[in-house]
Amino acid sequence: MPAPIDGAFSLVDHFGTPVDQRSYGDRHLLVFFGFSHCAVVCPRELAKLGAALRALGPLAARVQPLYVSVDPARDTPAVLRACVARHPGGFVGLTGSEAQVEAAKKSFRVFARRVPDAAAPGGYVVPHTALAYFMAPGGRYLAHFAESLDAPAVAARMTELMQGDTP
């Protein structure tokens, strides 16, 4: 049986402030792992998750979306700040040392590995798990959303989970 999603992390946000899963108070967390140089999957998923958050209406105030970098060598806080600014939804970019990012990946059971690619910026890409994780306040795992789900389906499931998990 696979290990459960732990949801723990200790990283820095896109302003350089240390954060962990408890830093967002009574808000649910919508967590997506990716990297700023991703050309297709990450921009598409961030747009979809942003649309899902907009579809929540007033409930969106109870959710903090997080974009966790799997490429800490390139994704500094400043790079992530610029990256999340291009995507609606109020995402906070998170990064850290290689060890911190590896610990967060392990906690969420995320696969990501640097692969050489001469055509890519910096000479490599980082294929990674493309799931969004929905966590209760404090970091308890509630659900994950596959890449194949559209924004209305994600919004409906988040609404259902928040109504059953009142603060």
Stretches found by the model and what they are:
Residues 1-22, 47:
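N-terminal "domain-start" segment that seeds a small globular fold
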Residues 6-7, 29, 129-130:
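Short loop/turn microsegments at loop-to-beta-strand junctions
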Residues 12, 92-96, 113:
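Short acidic-hydrophobic, aromatic-tinged amphipathic segments that line or gate anion-handling sites
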Residues 21-45, 49:
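Short active-site neighborhood of thiol/selenol oxidoreductases, capturing the structured segment around
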Residues 44-104:
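Structural microenvironment flanking redox-active thiols in thiol-disulfide oxidoreductases
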Residues 100-157:
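Thiol/disulfide oxidoreductase modules built on the thioredoxin-like
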Residues 158-166:
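Short, hydrophobic alpha-helical segments
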